[in-house]
Amino acid sequence: MPELPEVETTLRGLSPHLVGQRIHGVILRRPDLRWPIPEQIERLLPGATITNVRRRAKYLLIDTDAGGSVLLHLGMSGSLRVLPGDTLPRAHDHVDISLQSGRLLRFNDPRRFGCLLWQSGTQAHDLLAALGPEPLSDAFTGDYLHALAQGRRAAVKTFLMDQAVVVGVGNIYAAESLHRAGISPLREAGKVSLERYRRLADAVKDILAYAIQRGGTTLRDFISPDGAPGYFEQELFVYGREGEACKQCGRVLKHATIGQRATVWCGSCQR
């Protein structure tokens, strides 16, 4: 599933092509994605102008002057591309939004776990209402994590991936951040010290910022708007490396399922 760096990469690739563009039309080839596409998409978007494109957690919001925003989530396999207007649709090309420039924004989603919804006015959609702080913001600190973790018995990896704690940190970047901070993903969240949470917050910020710089992680289905691969996958220390040697100490990496997610870590470097 695309995580925060992949969504941020998508945002940065799309924005120059979308902001200020008038929408000519909308084609819905498959309106039943994770949730049905609401009728406002077809009714309100034609004739509207895109005023901004932004990100909240793993969601993209395309703001318009039509009294609301398109709320997008890429799901497990979704991608957004800006293409010439005469580009023929392929399998799983579910939505086209045609633009004044003669180009179109196309949403492709083979597994249909993504969504295309409508957020009215300035009121946050229900999907955004209970989200935690952005990990690259000043609100996300080790002190914040430590205070929130008190009394929690869940594994620290599960705690870090809780979107009510901090948004956008999925399986890849949680595993990599815990490795850099030297914290076992199995340790109870409430038993991690303040000093170690400060290291963890710093690791999350550094790794996410670097992954964005590298264009995200190309794993399975993720495609950036220009079709270019992300290069962070080449620098992964633990994620997806079960049974391989730790790049720091050389010992064989361990594997377990934590919170129904595959987890790889180094039993020597992470305590």
Swiss-Prot record:
Keyword Zinc-finger in annotation: yes
Cofactor section: Zn(2+)
Keyword Ribosomal protein tagged: no
SUPFAM superfamilies with a match to the protein in the record: Glucocorticoid receptor-like (DNA-binding domain) (SSF57716), N-terminal domain of MutM-like DNA repair proteins (SSF81624), S13-like H2TH domain (SSF46946)
Gene: mutM
Name of the protein: Formamidopyrimidine-DNA glycosylase
Annotated DNA binding sites: H92, R111, R152
Species, as recorded: Xanthomonas axonopodis pv. citri (strain 306)
Similarity comment: Belongs to the FPG family.
EC number: 3.2.2.23, 4.2.99.18
Function: Involved in base excision repair of DNA damaged by oxidation or by mutagenic agents. Acts as a DNA glycosylase that recognizes and removes damaged bases. Has a preference for oxidized purines, such as 7,8-dihydro-8-oxoguanine (8-oxoG). Has AP (apurinic/apyrimidinic) lyase activity and introduces nicks in the DNA strand. Cleaves the DNA backbone by beta-delta elimination to generate a single-strand break at the site of the removed base with both 3'- and 5'-phosphates.
Catalytic activity: Hydrolysis of DNA containing ring-opened 7-methylguanine residues, releasing 2,6-diamino-4-hydroxy-5-(N-methyl)formamidopyrimidine; 2'-deoxyribonucleotide-(2'-deoxyribose 5'-phosphate)-2'-deoxyribonucleotide-DNA = a 3'-end 2'-deoxyribonucleotide-(2,3-dehydro-2,3-deoxyribose 5'-phosphate)-DNA + a 5'-end 5'-phospho-2'-deoxyribonucleoside-DNA + H(+)
CDD domains xrefs: EcFpg-like_N
InterPro entries: DNA_glyclase/AP_lyase_DNA-bd, DNA_glyclase_Znf_dom_DNA_BS, Formamido-pyr_DNA_Glyclase, FPG_cat, MutM-like_N-ter, Ribosomal_uS13-like_H2TH, Znf_DNA_glyclase/AP_lyase, Znf_FPG/IleRS
ZnF segments: FPG-type: 237-271
GO biological process: base-excision repair
Free-text comment on the cofactor: Binds 1 zinc ion per subunit.
The protein's assembly and partners: Monomer.
